[in-house]
Regions:
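Substrate-binding/catalytic lobe of Class I Rossmann-like enzymes that use SAM or dcSAM, i.e.
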Residues: 175-264, 268
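Class I SAM-dependent transferase core
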Residues: 24-56
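A short SAM/SAH-binding and catalytic strip from SAM-dependent methyltransferases
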Residues: 133-145
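A short acidic, Gly/Pro-enriched loop at the edge of an enzyme's catalytic core
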Residues: 124-134
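Class I SAM-dependent methyltransferase SAM/SAH-binding core
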Residues: 74-76, 80-124
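A short glycine-rich, Lys/Arg-flanked "PGG" loop and its adjoining helix->strand segment in the class I
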Residues: 146-161
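Conserved alpha-helix/loop element of class I SAM-dependent methyltransferases that forms part
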Residues: 52-69
């Protein structure tokens, strides 16, 4: 007989669930460990089958902006280890940070002993090691902006660099169904308080917006039909339960419909409400 004992686990953050789902989806359908956006160029048609290629281009884009002379790198929010593996393949010495046990385990499985993974939040990282470059690839938005630069500077070698590739909130008017990201104005204001010089600042919103078009297409042509089918099934088989659910969870259901199935999560709104940027900063110790 199997062991049906349930083990009490600590609560799992919803972001971790989303990333773990993304990993399972990518591995099963594309044999890919990438969890970040794709970087879409004119020669790559926007389609779900081309997503792995666009994600590889995203990693290549980051690597192309690593300054000369960099030898050691800290990859903050390493996901499943795809970027770190690519970096070690180019002879960089890489360590990584991951607060998610599921993703950290996956990263260890593909990196082996090539990379030490700190299984902690970046804000809580404590090590004597220092690095030539710290990379935040779609992880910057999850870190306290009031603490991130002070913490990063602790682990930078003299004259080291910080590379951020992530999206930020713009000052566009109106309500956006697209969450995430620090305010871009706050980001620039915060930078001014630290001994950092912006060496590169590139807007890649146009090249990353097609990812949202793919998500919207999946929501409209897969997510919404499945959602409606579920409601039709429950309503037909259990009408009283259906009425209770609609009454009890009315506001949450309306929010889900508005956020995911209204068609507002599209590339046009992404380009309006978000600014996706690659920002490279050099430390300028006084």
């Amino acid at each position: 007989m199997g062991d049906n004992t349930r083990v009490c686990r600590k609560p799992v953050d919803s972001k971790e669930v989303g990333l773990a789902f993304g990993l399972i989806f990518g591995k099963y359908f594309f044999n890919s460990h990438h969890l970040h956006y794709g970087y879409w160029t004119d020669d790559v048609p926007v389609s779900i089958t081309n997503l792995p290629r666009a994600q590889e281009q995203y990693s290549d884009f980051i690597i192309s902006h690593i300054p000369l002379g960099v030898k050691t790198i800290l990859d903050v929010g390493c996901g499943a280890g795809a970027l770190a593996r690519k970096l070690t393949g180019k002879q960089y010495r890489v360590d990584a940070v991951s607060p998610c046990a599921i993703l950290a385990a996956e990263a260890r499985s593909i990196l082996g002993d090539k990379c030490h993974i700190y299984e902690t939040k970046f804000e809580q990282l404590d090590t004597d090691k220092k690095y030539d470059l710290i990379i935040f690839s779609e992880s910057f938005q999850y870190i306290d902006i009031g603490r991130v630069f002070e913490q990063a500077l602790r682990f930078l070698n003299k004259g080291g660099h910080i590379l951020i590739c992530d999206f930020f909130k713009t000052e566009a008017k109106g309500e956006s169904s697209l969450g995430g990201g620090h305010r871009l104005t706050e980001f620039y204001e915060t930078l001014k308080r630290y001994p950092l010089i912006v060496a590169t600042d590139i807007d890649i919103t146009k090249q990353t917006a097609p990812n949202i078009a793919l998500v919207d297409d999946m929501l409209q042509n897969f997510g919404r039909p499945v959602w409606n089918l579920l409601f039709d099934y429950v309503g037909g088989r259990h009408p009283l339960l259906f009425k209770l659910i609609n009454w009890k969870l009315k506001k949450k259901i309306e929010k889900i419909n508005r956020k995911y199935f209204s068609g507002s999560r599209n590339s046009q709104n992404f380009q309006l409400f978000k600014s996706y940027r690659l920002v490279l900063c050099k430390s300028n110790p006084i």
